[in-house]
Amino acid sequence: MKGKWAAGISPRNFTWVIRDRFAVSERPGGFGTSHRKVRREEELLWLSAQGFDRIISVLMGPSNLPAYTAHELDWGHHPIAATGDRRLALRECYFDLDKALSSARKVLLHGDELGDRVMGVVAGYLFWSGRITQGPAAISAVEHLLERSMGPEGRTLVADSERPTPDATQ
């Protein structure tokens, strides 16, 4: 493939959380009735060309996981439910993300859309990891970064993001 599309296209709403290390976007290829396999392929080409080597999905189902494997992109799947006790899922997601970032990997985290759930997971991670020491400050930082307000679902995820104890292991 040559020309403008040779390196693919960036995923919709792609935004760096930690420049050149950790980014978020909507699900590669889109979601629901707007999902397109061709677009997913182009976006996965772009992610590979940009050096991403870990994708973390917080979708409830295994959508796109076989495509990540086909593109030789390492992935983690941590379903974050819309309701209920999500603390264990958040903890597993945060440990995965922290391990990848500590290993100098380039990580993309996504949900179906870049909305409350992804915003809450990102703000929760920033708080959980100690990068931002207060939950409300993490919420404010993510709202500023993504240029949108976080609703109740996202704020609840931040509240559920318990800081690990110094001796915590997975």
Show which residues each predicted segment covers.
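Cys-dependent protein tyrosine phosphatase-like superfamily
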Residues: 1-108, 121-170
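Glycine-rich nucleophile elbow surrounding the catalytic serine of serine-hydrolase chemistry
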Residues: 115-121
